[in-house]
Structure formats: structure tokens, C-alpha cells
């Protein structure tokens, strides 16, 4: 019997990432939530069509809502359903988690920023974080630190030889 090649198997269940989140914000505390989706949205996500780059999460009436995420409908989606790719999507969270988020957002001035959208078993989950915006000098310092880390690795690699 032949061995299974683990390199060919794709274990990455990520649908979409918000790569700008860590660049534009200080990410403090991370959370995971489910999404309330319609059928055509699930089909679109299975095809890998999603964009959460310009999205954010807001709290209204004790519920969390995802705004600005784009799930473009497939051309073969049902024609009798009106597809709105930019609609508000409800996040499925426990009351305790919602109360925690409300307290931090209203009292401490945090924003809630989506980080990634992924499959967990058969469910679509969204990972998000409490975040504070970065100033321009903070962004420059992060770039400088990242470049120094790369240079340090290069120097260590060449010094070992």
C-alpha cells in the first residue's frame, strides 16, 4: 500500500484574511464567532469568494453585526433570491462574550476588527480582535523592527558558516 503524501493534502481552511488588520491596528484580544448566513452566501464561500479587508464589526441592541464584508454571489445561484453581497451579517456569540465586548468598546474605546474567515468542520467561523488604531510612527516602528529581525537572522546565518 502506498503512503499518503502529507504535502499534497491541504489543511488550510481559511476562506479570507484581513492582512491589513495587524498593520493598521494594535490587536489586543482575539475572539471566534459563527456567522448567520444565507444559502447563496455559503455557496459563494465554498467557492472561495469573500473579502473582509474593509469590514468591521459593530454592536447594536446587544448583538454583534459584520459590516462591509463582501460575499459576491455565484452566477449559478438561485434567481428567485435577491442577493445583496454587502448586507449586514449577524455574529453568533454568547451573552457573556457580547457583554465583554460591549464593555470594552464603549468604555475603553476599542474597535472590533475581523482577522480571518474560515471553515471549522461544516461551519463558517470568523476570527476577530479588539483593536486600537496605530499612529503613523507606530507603523514605521513595526516595519523597522521587522527589517531588523530579518537582518539579524541573515547575520546569524552567515556567522555560523
Swiss-Prot record:
<comment type="similarity">
    <text>Belongs to the SmpB family.</text>
</comment>
<protein>
    <recommendedName>
        <fullName>SsrA-binding protein</fullName>
    </recommendedName>
</protein>
<keyword id="KW-0694">RNA-binding</keyword>
<dbReference type="InterPro" id="IPR000037">
    <property type="entry name" value="SsrA-bd_prot"/>
</dbReference>
<dbReference type="Pfam" id="PF01668">
    <property type="entry name" value="SmpB"/>
</dbReference>
<dbReference type="InterPro" id="IPR023620">
    <property type="entry name" value="SmpB"/>
</dbReference>
<keyword id="KW-0963">Cytoplasm</keyword>
<comment type="function">
    <text>Required for rescue of stalled ribosomes mediated by trans-translation. Binds to transfer-messenger RNA (tmRNA), required for stable association of tmRNA with ribosomes. tmRNA and SmpB together mimic tRNA shape, replacing the anticodon stem-loop with SmpB. tmRNA is encoded by the ssrA gene; the 2 termini fold to resemble tRNA(Ala) and it encodes a 'tag peptide', a short internal open reading frame. During trans-translation Ala-aminoacylated tmRNA acts like a tRNA, entering the A-site of stalled ribosomes, displacing the stalled mRNA.</text>
</comment>
<dbReference type="GO" id="GO:0005829">
    <property type="term" value="C:cytosol"/>
</dbReference>
<dbReference type="GO" id="GO:0070929">
    <property type="term" value="P:trans-translation"/>
</dbReference>
<dbReference type="GO" id="GO:0003723">
    <property type="term" value="F:RNA binding"/>
</dbReference>
<dbReference type="InterPro" id="IPR020081">
    <property type="entry name" value="SsrA-bd_prot_CS"/>
</dbReference>
